[in-house]
Amino acid sequence: MRGLVLAEKPSLMRAIEGAYKDGGPFPFDLDFAAFHGHLMRQAEPAEYNPKWAPPYKAEDLPLIPEPFKYLPDDVPSVNKIMTKIRNGKYDFLVNACDAEREGEHIFWSFYEANNLKLPVKRLWCSTTLKADLVVALHNLRDASDFQHLREASFFRAQFDWLAGM
């Protein structure tokens, strides 16, 4: 089994990689890649519908996209990670973004916008201490354990978009 760890930031990726190298053996092989925070952004109103471009007209309100779309905010980084995923022959991905709602949103907005289908494991660790990361690597959880947090992250982002428009 081979997986790709997707960390929220390079410093976290390096910490996890160090724990993996020193904390084995593990029943899987891992490669590593890092986001740089938010790689994706929610589409702007005009990217859904040209008539939603500013200045806004009362007859077009409320602006409610269905479905909400995410687009690359950092195209070179998205392309680099997607190339690694496509060429890596991975059996699964590891969501190693921060252990909180926003971390879920960063990972899943990337995953869904890029139509990824690989199974996902969750590395859940709120510190970067090597010993804690080793324990978390030995106890990767199924992504479905965090479905509620994933949904909450998207509801929050959609609400913010609607309230801001």
Give names to the regions the model predicted.
Residues M1-M165:
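Intrinsically disordered, low-complexity regulatory segments
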